[in-house]
Amino acid sequence: MMNDLTWKEFERVDIRVGTILYAEEFKEAIKPAIKMTIDFGEEIGIKKSSAQITDHYNPESLVGIQVAAVINFPKKQIGPFMSECLVTGFTQSDGSIILAVPQKGALNGSRLA
């Protein structure tokens, strides 16, 4: 278990919901991954991300799914790809990742409360 953080620290993490518009295999990645283009609504716009989620997802199955992503981390260069947000998920006992998705449709750009 990690150290406690303050409410103020938690509020600094900007987690928003967005809809995956496009997904493709990240062929250049060292570990199997999928590149995604995600719509976070008018205010935030479109952002790109990469995630190692191939154990449970293929690119075609991701299009149209809403995901929760951290949008205020610095951009990160991953090989030839620039990731602009961090798609969130839950690590399973085997190390695979299950995406964090809203149970019901949410407005793109809505902030996690």
Model-derived features with residue positions:
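Phosphate-backbone binding interfaces of nucleic-acid-interacting proteins
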Residues: 1-113
